[in-house]
């Protein structure tokens, strides 16, 4: 037969829409025409496929060849279409007899020798293929990725000849070996931090409720050290979360997928990171740092040094848990539900009071004004991490609570939240806040008066209630008491700092 159809998958973000490769061989001048919105890398497939077919012992048809990648309105890029094009060519030229070709999907790049190479986004392609009821054949290079799925519908091959022999029923293909989580010893323990008890408490609340945290303090007080300990307090990823994170990571760094399997992402971009690097971008948009931090932590050190427009671009993803990237050739949505942890100095010199202060209140306010009010509103907790008191370093250090001990309380609090509302407190919307964060009338009036004094917004009111709800869950309390509210209000260091500076100016 001079016409053959092979199924494959594109890679558009974490989605893998189905693509049909149609090959027609007819009489006419020898040549190959490829249609269906192929990019340059796909057009180059004609040379790779030709050499791979010849070097695998087959004949390249010396006829007019037309290849259609359907649907035609979907942009296609990369070498992932090499294998399906080669198989479709061999089937159309009757060099390959495959009666069950419709039951399989093929994804892989071909070397000139006919060897198969891995492609980005193999996890998404395999997952979608299995959901559609077909089996998928991928390169052996992608074995570690598709092995995470533990699906019976994945097959791996290392050469075009092996795929052809399998489709003709002459040879069996291997299934990927299931991938287990790599066990790692905890490198950063909370007991390593000397003092800073309020900072440790704030970190516990942040981990328990999934909140966003801002650490403010002079240089060298342990802000970065505290932030790096948060992963030790968080639970391992569930199967669904692990596959989501692995699917995103496989688009940019497939080699790290197995190493980081089931581990919470912890992304710490440099403050010189561009807007595109942070939220994602490109002609066909790729994931940025906020998507790579999905289901994990995004840590921004030296917060005011980031470009203001880069930080303001995080405002919508923090609220919605996803980022919409619109470009001329593609519109892609990436998941971006992360915990934002940030650290900053209170002034350009690192201090805003005391003997070390070398800045006027105007200079300090100008420095803090690099951060917009709506962006600062997204932080549930802001803590001041002060200089350690004199003598604490010379005394014998008594280790504090370990990460394992604190993690037990975090897990118990999270269990209460999922049992009550099936989500973390940080993810509660307005109706759910009214339902699960009820206050006594006297406590509500006290909290409203406090917010008016601090000049906070309605969003800050809701975030304070969610933090108080988390504190109550840590205390195993069903109701939010005045004590819980007072502790939640105490974690508003940035507001107190701004009020202090305003008073100095008046």
Curated annotation (Swiss-Prot):
Entry-linked InterPro entries: AAA+_ATPase, CHLI-like, Mg_chelat-rel, Mg_chelat-rel_C, Mg_chelatse_chII-like_cat_dom, P-loop_NTPase, Ribosomal_Su5_D2-typ_SF, Ribsml_uS5_D2-typ_fold_subgr
Disulfide bond positions: none
SUPFAM superfamilies hit by this protein: P-loop containing nucleoside triphosphate hydrolases (SSF52540), Ribosomal protein S5 domain 2-like (SSF54211)
One short Pfam name that applies is: Mg_chelatase
- Give the signal peptide range: none
A GO MF label: ATP binding
Can you tell me which family this protein belongs to? Belongs to the Mg-chelatase subunits D/I family. ComM subfamily.
Question: Do you know which NCBIfam families this protein is assigned to?
Answer: PRK09862.1, YifB family Mg chelatase-like AAA ATPase
Q: What is this protein called?
A: Uncharacterized protein YifB
Instruction: Print the organism lineage.
Output: Bacteria, Pseudomonadati, Pseudomonadota, Gammaproteobacteria, Enterobacterales
Q: Which gene encodes it?
A: yifB
């Amino acid at each position: 037969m001079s016409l053959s159809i092979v199924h494959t998958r594109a890679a558009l973000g974490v989605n893998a829409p189905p693509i049909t490769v149609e090959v027609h061989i007819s009489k006419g001048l020898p040549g190959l025409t490829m249609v269906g919105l192929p990019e340059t890398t796909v057009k180059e497939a004609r040379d790779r496929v030709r050499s791979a077919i010849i070097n695998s012992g087959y004949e390249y048809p010396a006829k007019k060849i037309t290849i259609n990648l359907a649907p035609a309105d979907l942009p296609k890029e990369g070498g992932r279409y090499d294998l399906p094009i080669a198989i479709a060519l061999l089937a159309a030229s009757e060099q390959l007899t495959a009666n069950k070709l419709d039951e399989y999907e093929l994804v892989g790049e071909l070397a000139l020798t006919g060897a198969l190479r891995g492609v980005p986004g193999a996890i998404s392609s395999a997952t979608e293929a299995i959901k559609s009821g077909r089996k998928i054949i991928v390169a052996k290079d992608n074995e570690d990725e598709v092995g995470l799925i533990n699906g019976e519908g994945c097959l791996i091959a290392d050469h075009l000849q092996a795929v052809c022999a399998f489709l003709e029923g002459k040879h069996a293909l291997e299934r990927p070996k299931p991938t287990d989580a790599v066990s790692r010893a905890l490198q950063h323990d909370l007991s390593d931090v000397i003092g800073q008890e309020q900072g440790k408490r704030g970190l516990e609340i942040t981990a328990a409720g999934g909140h966003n945290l801002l650490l403010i303090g002079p240089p060298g007080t342990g802000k970065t050290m505290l932030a790096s300990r948060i992963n030790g307090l968080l639970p391992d990823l569930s199967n669904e979360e692990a596959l989501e994170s692995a699917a995103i990571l496989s688009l940019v760094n497939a080699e790290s997928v197995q190493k980081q399997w089931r581990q919470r992402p912890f992304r710490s971009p440099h403050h010189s990171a561009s807007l595109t690097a942070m939220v994602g971008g490109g002609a066909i948009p790729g994931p940025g740092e906020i998507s790579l931090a999905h289901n994990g932590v995004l840590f921004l050190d030296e917060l005011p040094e980031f470009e203001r427009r880069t930080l303001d671009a995080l405002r919508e993803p923090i609220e919605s848990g996803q980022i919409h990237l619109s470009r001329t050739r593609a519109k892609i949505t990436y998941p971006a539900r992360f915990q934002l942890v940030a650290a900053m100095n209170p002034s350009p010199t690192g201090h805003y009071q005391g003997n070390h202060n070398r800045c006027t209140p105007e200079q300090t306010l100008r420095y803090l004004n690099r951060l917009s009010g709506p962006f600062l509103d997204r932080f549930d907790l802001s803590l001041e991490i002060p200089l350690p008191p004199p003598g604490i370093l010379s005394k014998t250090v008594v280790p504090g609570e370990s990460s394992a001990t604190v993690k037990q309380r975090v897990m118990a609090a999270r269990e209460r939240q999922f049992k009550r509302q099936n989500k973390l407190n940080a993810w509660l919307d307005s109706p759910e806040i009214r339902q699960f964060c009820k206050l006594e009338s006297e406590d509500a009036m006290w909290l409203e008066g406090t917010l008016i004094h601090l000049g906070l917004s309605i969003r800050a009111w809701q975030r304070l209630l969610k933090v108080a709800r988390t504190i109550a869950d840590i205390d195993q309390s069903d109701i939010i008491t005045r004590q819980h509210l007072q502790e939640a209000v105490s974690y508003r260091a940035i507001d107190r700092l701004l009020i202090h500076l305003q008073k100095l100016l008046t």
